[in-house]
């Protein structure tokens, strides 16, 4: 039961962080492109790579990994928003933006997850 509570609390925290940070980013960069989801998913990808490496190196307990990776980062990142916003761009006739957003999100996320993983290795030694 404790593990479920860790995931639930982490998910609530991650969702609140996504909402607040997303509003800040979108307000700063303006409408016309889903900057907030791109930013949040990119940051979350970096942090999941970092969390994975720290966990593999024994620097995080299993409970901390559940709280951070499954809870906080699971609530923080959002694939459903990426899908919705890509579809909205397509329906608006902005095919180029939609493709840039979808593929850019995927490649940026993978690249940042790799960087986070490498940073975790450097931090642990």
Swiss-Prot record:
<dbReference type="GO" id="GO:0046872">
    <property type="term" value="F:metal ion binding"/>
</dbReference>
<keyword id="KW-0406">Ion transport</keyword>
<feature type="transmembrane region" description="Helical">
    <location>
        <begin position="29"/>
        <end position="49"/>
    </location>
</feature>
<protein>
    <recommendedName>
        <fullName>Fluoride-specific ion channel FluC</fullName>
    </recommendedName>
</protein>
<keyword id="KW-0813">Transport</keyword>
<keyword id="KW-1133">Transmembrane helix</keyword>
<comment type="similarity">
    <text>Belongs to the fluoride channel Fluc/FEX (TC 1.A.43) family.</text>
</comment>
<feature type="transmembrane region" description="Helical">
    <location>
        <begin position="95"/>
        <end position="115"/>
    </location>
</feature>
<comment type="function">
    <text>Fluoride-specific ion channel. Important for reducing fluoride concentration in the cell, thus reducing its toxicity.</text>
</comment>
<feature type="transmembrane region" description="Helical">
    <location>
        <begin position="5"/>
        <end position="25"/>
    </location>
</feature>
<keyword id="KW-0479">Metal-binding</keyword>
<dbReference type="InterPro" id="IPR003691">
    <property type="entry name" value="FluC"/>
</dbReference>
<keyword id="KW-0812">Transmembrane</keyword>
<dbReference type="GO" id="GO:0005886">
    <property type="term" value="C:plasma membrane"/>
</dbReference>
<dbReference type="GO" id="GO:0062054">
    <property type="term" value="F:fluoride channel activity"/>
</dbReference>
<dbReference type="Pfam" id="PF02537">
    <property type="entry name" value="CRCB"/>
</dbReference>
<feature type="transmembrane region" description="Helical">
    <location>
        <begin position="66"/>
        <end position="86"/>
    </location>
</feature>
<keyword id="KW-1003">Cell membrane</keyword>
<keyword id="KW-0407">Ion channel</keyword>
<feature type="binding site">
    <location>
        <position position="74"/>
    </location>
    <ligand>
        <name>Na(+)</name>
    </ligand>
</feature>
<keyword id="KW-0472">Membrane</keyword>
<dbReference type="GO" id="GO:0140114">
    <property type="term" value="P:cellular detoxification of fluoride"/>
</dbReference>
<feature type="binding site">
    <location>
        <position position="77"/>
    </location>
    <ligand>
        <name>Na(+)</name>
    </ligand>
</feature>
<keyword id="KW-0997">Cell inner membrane</keyword>
<keyword id="KW-0915">Sodium</keyword>
């Amino acid at each position: 039961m404790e593990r479920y509570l860790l995931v639930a609390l982490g998910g609530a925290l991650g969702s609140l962080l996504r909402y607040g940070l997303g509003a800040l980013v979108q307000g700063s960069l303006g409408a016309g492109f889903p900057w907030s989801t791109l930013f949040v998913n990119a940051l979350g990808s970096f942090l999941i790579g970092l969390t994975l490496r720290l966990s593999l190196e024994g620097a995080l307990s299993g409970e901390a990994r559940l709280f951070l990776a499954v809870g906080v980062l699971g609530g923080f990142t959002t694939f459903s928003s990426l899908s919705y916003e890509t579809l909205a761009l397509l329906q608006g006739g902005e095919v180029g933006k939609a493709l840039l957003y979808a593929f850019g999100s995927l490649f940026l996320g993978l690249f940042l997850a790799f960087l986070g993983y490498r940073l975790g290795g450097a931090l642990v030694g």
